[in-house]
Amino acid sequence: MAGENRALAQGQSQSCRAGQAWQWDGVHFRILSPDETGREGNDASCVLQVSAGNFTALLPGDIEAKTELALVRRYRESLAASILLAPHHGSKTSSTPVFIRFTDPQHVIFSSGYLNRFNHPDPAVVARYHRHGSTLHHSALSGHLRVLVNPESGPGDVLSYRETRPRFWSGRP
């Protein structure tokens, strides 16, 4: 799925638009953005909300502050997420205080490469989530992450590959 016309023109993607929704094996999927305002670039990212029982994950793609504010205005408290994939890898153009307040994430995942050239996530963004009280996870430091979910109680553990599969040279017993 893609929100930007340029990606759609290449023919390998389907359009995503706010309001699209489906259910699969008791899990609800809902597209929250882009709407019909003609967003481009990062702000045309598909924003996907995934929910099952008391668990909700929000996957906002590369949206920036302008789209975060539009989502807060439109969805308010229904943006609350047990797990939040940090918008735009935690760049300084995203994760505004109001967005953090309304998403109220228990866990935040920063998806970025180790020593990436963009310096994602931005230290100020990490600090905002830390002050909010969210548990933070960095793919650059952890390797892939796996979230264990119980639909009745929400997210359980977030498991790091490097913690569950340490190499013999890591020096951990």
Which residue stretches match the model-derived regions?
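Non-globular, low-confidence helical/coil segments that flank catalytic cores
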Residues: 1-173
